[in-house]
């Protein structure tokens, strides 16, 4: 089982305040564990333009048709002061890792400098912090019915309204998660 470029979808019984009703995009999955970004938990009162202002980045030349008032996500409980940008190619920034044919993660300032300009990648999601699991930890959480998994979908990752991502991600595997009971058993 390789969960890279998959969604983790929190089961209704998962009540952890950070992960409750969350969708996590898995960026890396290997023998050492997993790393992902929550894609549906916007930080209060923080938008992309606020990050750019804080870092003194002025988009040049500014394309007014590109909106910078998109919310910044809480990517997870670790390194909440560190930025992670999920985007579509190109991946020619100084700290980019290609996750799939159409998804890249970048942690360097140079991608931020393209936001709001014609050089910006087509789709962008900005997050602060990340989520991580040690070897075997995520697999155990899945066995314990904390998570569903589904192949990642670009539309949900970048375009689906944030409030709908949990429900829509579950629909990828034919589940109406809103009507699912809070406690599941093993068959």
UniProtKB/Swiss-Prot annotation:
Read off the InterPro entries from this record: AlgH-like
Sorted alphabetically, which SUPFAM superfamilies does this protein's record hold?
VC0467-like
* Organism listed in the record: Klebsiella pneumoniae subsp. pneumoniae (strain ATCC 700721 / MGH 78578)
Q: Name the protein family.
A: Belongs to the UPF0301 (AlgH) family.
Query: Which Gene Ontology cellular component terms are annotated?
Result: cytosol
Name of the protein in question:
UPF0301 protein KPN78578_33170
* Taxonomic lineage: Bacteria, Pseudomonadati, Pseudomonadota, Gammaproteobacteria, Enterobacterales
